[in-house]
Amino acid sequence: VKCYAVVDTNVIVSALITKNPDSPPRQVFRAMLTGDIVPLYHPDILAEYEEVLCQKKFHLQVETVRTVVDAIRQFGIEVQPKPTGEILIDMDDLVFYEVAMEKRDDGAYLVTGNQKHYPVRHFIVTPAEMVEILKK
């Protein structure tokens, strides 16, 4: 099953720094690279990925970060969402939510480790839930 999904930065970070190759974030990340998940993005999302992943605390090489961001750009679809008017706890998260909303007609999901940052919606799922959806 091919799924469209906006993947929150925290999931990408977890996928890249985990020691567990079978962790749900790693499985979601792998699915983005194999085409099981078509990543949806906006330039602001790619910029956030790059900014966060380059933080020293994650010990990731700049080349690794660029490769990841380029792969998401290459395999994904750029979305220019319409404003939803939604007010979120962290307004930096709004672009992730709005990109998912824009592609809801295609069944898009938002995959995040921080569900509390978003309104409760059935399409906002954890990495573990996304792994289960992919198995269907």
Regions found by a protein language model. Give the residues of each.
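Intrinsically disordered, low-complexity and often Lys/Arg-enriched segments
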Residues: 1-3
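PIN/NYN-family metal-dependent endoribonuclease catalytic core
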Residues: 6-7, 19, 24-54
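Alpha-helix capping/helix-boundary segments
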Residues: 11-12, 45, 96, 116-117
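Acidic catalytic patch
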Residues: 43-46, 64-88
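Acidic, metal-coordinating catalytic cores used for nucleic-acid/nucleotide bond scission
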Residues: 86-92, 116
